[in-house]
Regions:
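Sec/Tat signal peptide C-region and signal peptidase I cleavage site
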Residues: 28-34
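Residues at alpha-helix termini
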Residues: 63-65, 156, 197, 259, ...
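Conserved C-terminal helix/tail region of periplasmic/extracytoplasmic solute-binding proteins
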Residues: 297-337
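Bacterial N-terminal signal peptides that target proteins for export
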Residues: 2-18
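Secondary-structure end/capping motifs
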Residues: 226-310
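Short, glycine-/small- and polar/acidic-enriched structural segments
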Residues: 34-167, 173-178, 182-188, 202-205, ...
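Pocket-lining segment of extracytoplasmic ligand-binding domains
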Residues: 94-95, 171-264
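Bacterial N-terminal signal peptides
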Residues: 15-27
Length: 337
C-alpha cells in the first residue's frame, strides 16, 4: 500500500476557488488504468475509522483486481489527483467540484452518512443560543462538520464569532477535555471518551434534520466505463463488507487480524476498534444499499443549506452528480436490502 503525505483529514470537503483553479490546471484528463487495475486516492491517513474500507479493498484484491491506495494529506488533494488523472477513484463528497468545474466526475457509492455530535463544555454553554457570538472548532474548511455547525447556527438564529479548524475528531475531543476548546463537534468515539473521562462536564446539543453523506466514492466517468467489471467487484465487496459489519460490528477486529491491517496501531487504539464500529452501526452510519436517489436528494438539501451547493435543491439533477450503474449491477448480484 503506497502512502503519500499524511495528515488527519477525514472529512475535508471540496470547496473554494483555489481548488477550482487547480482542477482546471489539471485539465480533467481521464485516467489510463490498466485492465483490472485501480488507484484509489484517500484524503486521510489509515485509521480505525477506515478499517471497513481497507477490508473491502483486501477482498477486492482477492478477486483479482489490482488495487493501489495512496493516502494524501487532505481530500481536496485527493480530488485533484482524480480530476488530473493521477488516481482513478477518490473518497469524499466533491459536490462543489462537480458543480463549479463541471468536471467529468461522478459519485457512485455512498460509504457513510454524517453521524456527529455537537458538544459543549457545560461550564460555559448549555444550549445553541449560548453559542451566539462564541467560537467553535470543526474539522476543516468546507467539511461535513463545518456544514453541520453552520446549518445548526441558521436553524437556531445565531452567529459564531469564529470557526477554528482542528483536524481529527480525537484531537478536538482532547482539546475539549483539556479546556483549549469549549464548543466543537466530534464522532461517537470522541463523545464516548468525553463522557467516560469527564462525566457531566460536557453536553451534546440537540441536532435534528441532518441526514447527508459523509464519505462516498467518485471517479472519472471514462474510468467507470473502461473499468466497469473491476468497479463492480469493488462495489460488491463494499456491500458485502458493510452488511457483515452491520450484522456484527465485532467482526472488524477479526478481519483486521486476518488481513494484517494497521499492524502498527498503538495498543491504546486497538481497544477502540470494536466500540467505534458498534457506535457507528448503532447510528446507522454505514448504509447497506450503497445509497440511492433519496440519499442524494438529502445531500442536496443539506449541502445547499450549508452553502456548499448552489441553487434550489429541488431543481438539482441527481444525474449531474451521481451515476448508479455500478451500484445497480452489484445489487443485482448480491441482492438488495
Amino acid at each position: 500500500m503506497q502512502v503519500g503525505m499524511q495528515m488527519r483529514g477525514g472529512l475535508t470537503r471540496i470547496f473554494g476557488a483555489a481548488l477550482v483553479a487547480a482542477a482546471f490546471a489539471f485539465g480533467g484528463t481521464a485516467p489510463a488504468a490498466a485492465d483490472g487495475k485501480m488507484h484509489i486516492a484517500f484524503g486521510d491517513i489509515a485509521t480505525v475509522e477506515s478499517l471497513n474500507f481497507l477490508i473491502a479493498i483486501e477482498r477486492t484484491k482477492e478477486r483479482g483486481v489490482d488495487v493501489e491506495v495512496t493516502f494524501f494529506k487532505s481530500e481536496d488533494v485527493a480530488a485533484q489527483a482524480v480530476v488530473g488523472g493521477q488516481a482513478d477513484i477518490g473518497v469524499g463528497t466533491p459536490y462543489a467540484l462537480i458543480q463549479k468545474v463541471k468536471a467529468p466526475v461522478r459519485l457512485f457509492y455512498q460509504m457513510s452518512a454524517l453521524r456527529f455530535f455537537p458538544i459543549v463544555n457545560t461550564e460555559f454553554y448549555k444550549s445553541w443560543k449560548d453559542l451566539d457570538g462564541q467560537e467553535i472548532a470543526v474539522h476543516s474548511r468546507g467539511s461535513g462538520t463545518e456544514a453541520i455547525m453552520k446549518l445548526m447556527a441558521q436553524k437556531n438564529g445565531i452567529t459564531y464569532s469564529n470557526i477554528s479548524y482542528v483536524p481529527g475528531s480525537e484531537v478536538r475531543a482532547g482539546a475539549l477535555l483539556q479546556g483549549n476548546v469549549k464548543a466543537s463537534i466530534v464522532d461517537s468515539t470522541g463523545k464516548n471518551m468525553l463522557e467516560a473521562k469527564a462525566p457531566g462536564k460536557f453536553l451534546v446539543l440537540p441536532m435534528e434534520g441532518v441526514n447527508a453523506t459523509d464519505e462516498a466514492l467518485y471517479a472519472n466517468t471514462e474510468f467507470l466505463k473502461a473499468q466497469a467489471p473491476a468497479v463492480e467487484i469493488l462495489v460488491e465487496e463494499l456491500l458485502k463488507t458493510w452488511r457483515e459489519i452491520n450484522a456484527n460490528p465485532k467482526v472488524v477486529a477479526d478481519l483486521r487480524k486476518k488481513y494484517n491491517l494497521l499492524s502498527d496501531l498503538p495498543p491504546e487504539l486497538e481497544g477502540e476498534v470494536v466500540p467505534y464500529y458498534e457506535g457507528a452501526v448503532a447510528t446507522k452510519a454505514f448504509p447497506s444499499d450503497g445509497g440511492g436517489e433519496a440519499a442524494v436528494k438529502d445531500d442536496f438539501g443539506f449541502y445547499a443549506l450549508a452553502g456548499q451547493i448552489e441553487g434550489d435543491p429541488a431543481s438539482l439533477k441527481v444525474e449531474d452528480f451521481w451515476t448508479f450503474e455500478p451500484l445497480q449491477k452489484a445489487l443485482a448480484k448480491v441482492g438488495a436490502q
